[in-house]
């Protein structure tokens, strides 16, 4: 677990913003965070025990939404290269499965937000 570092965020603090380079995967250990659209509207909450930034592991790119701490929050954070290496060391098949799930999620989001 030496590739992980603990980061703390105060309620209202942005963890990442729309358009930022996607370079890390976050595991939310305490608190909750919310996804915020480019217009500033919160549209989803991620609770304690969940993760965010999974797309960074596989494809990098830029953040499609901002993430803001809804409450004080503590995350375990790992860089996307380290996370990918860790994932591959467990099973290369997991990478293929995750890529498929991310594609499905992207398609569902495109349909949802095109209406």
Annotate each predicted stretch with a short phrase.
Residues 1-115:
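Cytosolic regulatory regions built on CNB/CRP/Popeye-like sensor folds
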